[in-house]
């Protein structure tokens, strides 16, 4: 009985000592958190291993992340994974669709993003671009003649329109001279004519009577305007004037209308500020609806695919410029010892318990061996 009690005692003591020793060793990895002094003498093994080597641990963790976890090869493989790409494209489509179907106005969205000033800047920029384009256009065309400046199709249209213009002018002239206003104007012209010819012609005019002269001249004028020869004459005159105009420089236009006036007139007609304001008052959905399907089905997948391709090709450079090792090192260095202890224990809790139990098991086995040795020695 005493023999079995001795063996049980040595086994129990061995297990307790082995388990406690391992448990103490694990605790000494983290504790104490700070060095302990007796007078000027620092107690050995203080602080614990991890608090003492925290800076070195931070450096090594940074290297481990860069060299073994977030490697260019691993990230590149992930970026080229077909399932990952499909998932990312689907996520991007959902998020973009949320944005482009928003019923809030563009103005409200700009204010929300603190870029409300973009309306003024956009107006000024558009007006500046229009002004520059017009000025560049005029600078170029002012070096041409009208024949060079106008397209061949315009030349043809003008030349084909000249006979019609002649007919229109004569038709309007006939209509005018048939009216009372035209007759009155013709009468005044006759009066002025006789008045300028001296007393003799004035006497003849008085003898014939003004009304009778107008009544005689008016039908002749109308008859003259209605003749084909008159139409051909006017057509020839207009044709000659057109030929002269084609040979003149476009720059001569500047003597009648200055560049600034042309630019100002075009800007007034375009109404840039009003157009921009109306555009911004529309909802995001109204603006994007015509191209919504194109954006979701073509633009988003294309952008995501190209972005992933670019990321795959430049992943090494990106990781290098991110300085991940330094980021990890800085973050770990800012951890308190308590937080670092919690972090390590949350990862290795079960394994550390097993180490404690293993120490108890080994201690118990050593106790059994000691008990057997004592038995044989007796």
Curated annotation (Swiss-Prot):
Primary site of residence: membrane
InterPro entries per the UniProt record, alphabetical: DUF445, UCP032178
Gene Ontology cellular component list: plasma membrane
UniProt membrane topology term: Multi-pass membrane protein
Membrane-spanning parts: 1-21, 357-377
Magnesium found in the keyword field: no
Swiss-Prot/TrEMBL keywords: Cell membrane, Membrane, Transmembrane, Transmembrane helix
Entry keyword Aminoacyl-tRNA synthetase: no
Location within or outside the cell: Cell membrane
Pfam hit, one: DUF445
Family: Belongs to the UPF0754 family.
Name of the protein described by the UniProt record: UPF0754 membrane protein BT9727_0767
């Amino acid at each position: 009985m005493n023999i079995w009690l001795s063996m049980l005692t040595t086994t129990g003591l061995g297990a307790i000592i082995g388990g406690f020793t391992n448990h103490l060793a694990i605790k000494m990895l983290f504790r104490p958190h700070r060095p302990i002094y007796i007078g000027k003498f620092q107690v050995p093994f203080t602080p614990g291993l991890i608090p003492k080597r925290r800076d070195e641990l931070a450096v090594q963790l940074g290297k481990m992340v860069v060299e073994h976890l977030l490697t260019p090869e691993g990230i590149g493989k992930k970026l080229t994974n077909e399932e990952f790409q499909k998932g990312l494209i689907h996520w991007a489509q959902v998020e973009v669709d949320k944005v482009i179907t928003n019923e809030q106005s563009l103005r409200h969205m700009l204010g929300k993003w603190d870029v409300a000033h973009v309306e003024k800047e956009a107006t000024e920029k558009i007006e500046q671009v229009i002004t520059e384009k017009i000025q560049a256009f005029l600078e170029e065309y002012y070096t041409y003649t009208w024949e060079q400046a106008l397209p061949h199709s315009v030349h043809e249209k003008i030349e084909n329109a000249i006979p019609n213009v002649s007919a229109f002018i004569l038709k309007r002239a006939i209509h005018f001279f048939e009216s009372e206003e035209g007759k009155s104007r013709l009468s005044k012209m006759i009066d002025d004519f006789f008045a300028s010819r001296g007393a003799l012609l004035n006497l003849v005019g008085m003898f014939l009577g003004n009304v009778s002269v107008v009544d005689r001249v008016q039908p002749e004028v109308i008859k003259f305007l209605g003749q084909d020869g008159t139409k051909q004459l006017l057509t020839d005159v207009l044709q000659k004037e057109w030929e002269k105009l084609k040979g003149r420089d476009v720059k001569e236009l500047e003597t009648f209308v200055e560049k600034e006036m042309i630019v100002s007139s075009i800007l007034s007609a375009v109404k840039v500020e009003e157009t921009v304001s109306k555009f911004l008052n529309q909802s995001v959905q109204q603006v994007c609806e015509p191209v919504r399907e194109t954006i979701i089905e073509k633009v988003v997948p294309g952008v995501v695919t190209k972005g992933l391709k670019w990321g795959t090709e430049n992943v090494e450079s990106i990781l290098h410029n991110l300085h991940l090792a330094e980021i990890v090192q800085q973050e770990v260095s800012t951890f308190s010892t308590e937080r670092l202890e919690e972090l390590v224990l949350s990862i290795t809790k079960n394994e550390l318990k097993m180490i404690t139990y293993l120490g108890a098991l080994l201690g118990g086995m050593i106790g059994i061996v000691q008990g057997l040795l004592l038995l044989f020695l007796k």
